[in-house]
Amino acid sequence: QNLSVLEKAVPTSAKSWAGYVTDELTEEGVKQTLDEVAYLADYIAGDIKDDYKKLEAIAKWVSDNIYYDRDARDNSVTQSEICIKNVLKSRKTVCVGYSALFSALCEAQGLYVVNVKGTVTSDTVDYSDLADGPVNHEWCAALIDDRWIWVDCVWNSNLKFENNEFTSVGANTEMYFDISPLALSFDHCAYLAEKRYYFRAGEYFSQQDT
């Protein structure tokens, strides 16, 4: 099921791309944030030429530098807490923010990535409930050399923000970078894949002028 969802990735709107970039939804704000993303992506990729290694480096940077915001998770998550601008500024977010930042960094390097919404195992969802469970998570998949590569930067990270404190609850892992489809299916069930073009978000403002 997971792979079949990727093959049917749905297009999204320019307004949604802009909204994932910044909650201000201004042309200047979008441009400024995307400039930051492009600069950071170049910094992370450095002299790496191989697309797979670029993908790996970006995934590792996100997992090593962004904290999972449990305080936000336990309350009502706002657009401000998941937009790329504020994720970069605060270094904390929930799964949607991880997914947005990772995919935007990849887009800046010319990598094809989709954002995946679905169900994962949790305190309230076990394996037997995955197929029928609530949509409670977002992660990514990249297409390189005609092969889909699953990436979950949240599940690779042990950095947490809780009770207004940044903490580490153990060493990070790369288990959920290029995890096999079979292994992923034990705790992730994809429901929908979205294709976003953050660097075309300016189209939204052009549409408003016509």
Where are these regions (language model features)?
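Secondary-structure boundary elements
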Residues: 2-91, 100-103
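Alpha-helical and coiled-coil interaction segments, frequently adjacent to or embedded
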Residues: 160-210
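Hydrophobic/aromatic-rich core segments of domains that either
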Residues: 99-180
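Serine/threonine-rich low-complexity intrinsically disordered regions
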Residues: 2, 11-16, 26-27, 78, ...
